[in-house]
Amino acid sequence: MKITYRKSAIGYSRDQKATIRSLGLRRLNSVVIHDDTPTIRGMVFKVRHLVSVEEIADDTSPDAETGADLERDGGNRS
């Protein structure tokens, strides 16, 4: 599942801010890819008003699009 951080957590509880961080979301409009597990679904449910979620194909691995490779090569994908 693809999770996008859409609304700031400022003014919301520490619990919700911690959940956003635990999902790996750091800045607005950042995107993370996670496996569709009950744990992740519960975290998303808790902050559903701050994020948007898209289902992605099962053949996409979580590491394929996390952005870690973008940071290593300066944002250039080839």
Curated annotation (Swiss-Prot):
Residues 58-68 have a biased composition (Acidic residues). It comes from the Bacteria. Gene3D superfamilies: Ribosomal protein L30, ferredoxin-like fold domain. Pfam families: Ribosomal_L30. GO terms for biological process: translation. Residues 58-78 are annotated as: Disordered. NCBIfam families: rpmD_bact. This is Large ribosomal subunit protein uL30. The gene is rpmD.
